[in-house]
């Protein structure tokens, strides 16, 4: 009859596991510290530019110049620890060329929550600004919304869809946030990203101005497809 023998505990294995656990904890602490002190982990901001570049190359047919400009602008902005201006991107062109698709990819690869991130704010003229007669009210609401969210998190993304359908005048309240000043209304906004879709007289790069729009605020996620041009 075989007798089962209980050997000594495998201390080598236990010590090995303990070392691995301590190493993992130390790595987590370093990562957490880097996220706490650095700019890359602010407010759900977790940019994956290689992933974005790969996805654009695989799924956005044509638009090579536009893709290159988007990636180049984002790289320069994200890698700058203290940008002098917010990043302003204007995606414009005919329906079906990828504007909305690109904007949804930007949110997906810049924020861990994508379009559902509390720091990604998507505005639609039909949903948020439906009544041109309420433009003055919309101006006050939009200014307060942008200012409040930038105060809570400088790494915020503001996406304005269908700019051509916005009543004139609303976007004027954004001009102070798009310029070279360091602080607006007591808020540091230089790490923010503004994306304007389907606005023909667009400006592309750090800084710019917009015009025309209206509506109430909380941000609904959404995305579709349209043409992309860079200027």
From Swiss-Prot:
Record's InterPro entries?
P-loop_NTPase, Torsin
Question: Which of this chain's residues are annotated to bind ATP?
Answer: 93-100
Glycosylation: which residues? 149
Pfam families per the UniProt record, alphabetical = Torsin
State where it is primarily located: secreted
A cellular component term from Gene Ontology for this protein is: extracellular region
| Keyword Transcription recorded | no
A GO molecular-function descriptor = hormone activity
Cleavable signal peptide: 1-27
Where found? Secreted
Q: What is the designated name of this protein? A: Prosalusin
Source organism per entry reads Rattus norvegicus (Rat)
